[in-house]
């Protein structure tokens, strides 16, 4: 509900958003930085993620151990993650400890010291993270897949970066990146739960006043390119991914049409892919579809794993189902998909962590809060013909494929 939502902008330009949920005892805090891997140039690849790691390694007032101990002392859960377009630092604590959590988050964002010995240690940690990813067939195939979808573009590069660039980063590199992107105009503080907006604003003014004013960071437009790739790996099954140009999140009507398409086609146990590929033909255990979305681009993805000798049949059946999806959608499918989507969205509204991230991401993306009632109206007004038209648009785009399996399947 709109009356629970409040927004203020500090003198330095920092946006403070709150959503009051008086029936809970906790708060979720998100500090959203509008910068991620797609903002990096070729010499910076991996720095957004590396910086996120370094934020917890000590400040001018706290050691890394003290940061961890202080959060444990208030029973808090805190962490951070890096995406293509945002880096998010978050905490969840009891309402009575909100100010203490804000104090720690403000400290690590503004006062990290980037000690050279900590940089060297964390470099080794990230190398292990990369190695773990390379040993994971799912991570490996999706990395290859996106390198074809967004060939030679930041969106097509791994968020973790590569050892060549990671090994070059020094304290000066991190401080320069912070100076460029971690300014008040590019940050959003969002808090949801049992929260008093005026108190949050007062705390933010005290804790974030040293943030300099600045502009929002920009990136180059993404261009869907597509292509085919193959990874030779001896596994029990072969995994196939098919991709098409999807929908960006900036257009909500198109976005939710695509979301409904993904649900009908491969989003659940009653979906077409699950019923046909798994239940009827027994070709795959895991099969489905979804839309990955960015501010100016999107990728509609179909995935399935099968026995090596069934790959050709799987591909043929997937193509047949794609064709059928462009021809007809029945009312029962529409009702199920809308109910599923509405249920997921509305049930998520009850979680403080979701709500805090939602209001922050809404404002970072659209410059406003989009209440769930508005989303529900969009979903309600979508017709079967809208889904068919969306399917035709998406599936007529260039196909991207990625396969991981034994070498004799190359070029099947």
From Swiss-Prot:
UniProtKB keywords: Hydrolase, Metal-binding, Metalloprotease, Protease, Zinc
Residue sites binding Zn(2+) per the record: 49, 53, 129
PROSITE patterns cross-referenced by the UniProt entry: INSULINASE
GO terms (BP aspect): proteolysis
Gene Ontology molecular function terms on file: metal ion binding; metalloendopeptidase activity
Cofactor(s) needed for function: Zn(2+)
Catalytic-site annotation from UniProt: 52 (proton acceptor)
Co-factor remark: Divalent metal cations. Binds Zn(2+).
EC code(s) of this entry: 3.4.24.-
Family: Belongs to the peptidase M16 family.
Protein name as it appears in the record: Uncharacterized zinc protease RF_0338
Species of origin: Rickettsia felis (strain ATCC VR-1525 / URRWXCal2)
């Amino acid at each position: 509900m709109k009356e629970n939502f409040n927004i203020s902008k500090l003198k330095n330009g920092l946006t403070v958003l709150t959503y009051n949920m008086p029936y809970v005892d906790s708060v979720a805090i998100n500090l959203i930085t509008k910068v991620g891997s797609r903002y990096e140039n070729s010499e910076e690849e991996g720095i957004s993620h590396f910086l996120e790691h370094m934020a917890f390694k000590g400040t001018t007032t706290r050691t890394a151990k003290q940061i961890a101990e202080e959060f444990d002392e208030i029973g808090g859960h805190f962490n951070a993650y890096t995406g293509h377009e945002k880096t998010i630092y978050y905490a969840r604590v009891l309402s009575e400890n909100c100010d203490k959590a804000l104090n720690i988050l403000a400290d690590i964002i503004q006062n990290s010291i980037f000690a050279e010995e900590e940089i060297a240690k964390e470099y080794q940690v990230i190398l292990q993270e990369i190695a773990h990813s390379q040993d994971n067939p799912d991570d490996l195939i999706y990395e290859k897949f996106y390198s074809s979808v967004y060939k030679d573009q930041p969106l097509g590069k791994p968020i973790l970066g590569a050892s060549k660039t990671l090994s070059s980063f020094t304290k000066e590199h991190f401080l320069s990146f912070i100076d460029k992107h971690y300014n008040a105009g590019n940050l959003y503080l969002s808090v949801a739960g049992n929260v008093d907006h005026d108190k949050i604003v007062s705390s933010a003014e005290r804790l974030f006043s040293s943030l300099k004013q600045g502009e929002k960071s920009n990136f180059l437009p993404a261009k869907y390119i597509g292509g085919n790739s193959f990874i030779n790996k001896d596994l029990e099954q072969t995994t196939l991914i098919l991709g098409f140009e999807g929908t960006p999140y900036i257009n909500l009507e198109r976005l939710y049409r695509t979301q409904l398409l993904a649900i009908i086609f491969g989003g659940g146990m009653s979906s077409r892919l699950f019923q046909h590929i798994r239940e009827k033909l027994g070709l795959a255990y895991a099969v489905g579809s979804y839309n990955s979305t960015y501010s100016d681009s999107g990728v509609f993805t179909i995935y399935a794993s099968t026995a090596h000798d069934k790959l050709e049949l799987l591909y043929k059946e997937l193509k047949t189902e794609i064709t059928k999806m462009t021809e007809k959608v029945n009312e029962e499918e529409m009702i199920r998909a809308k109910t599923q989507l509405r249920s997921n969205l509305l049930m998520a509204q009850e979680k403080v962590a979701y709500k805090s991230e939602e209001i922050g991401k809404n404002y970072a993306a659209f410059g406003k809060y989009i209440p769930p009632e508005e989303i529900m109206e969009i979903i309600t007004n979508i017709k079967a013909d809208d889904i068919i038209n969306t399917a035709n648009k998406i599936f007529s785009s260039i196909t991207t494929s990625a396969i991981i399996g034994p070498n004799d399947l190359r070029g099947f």
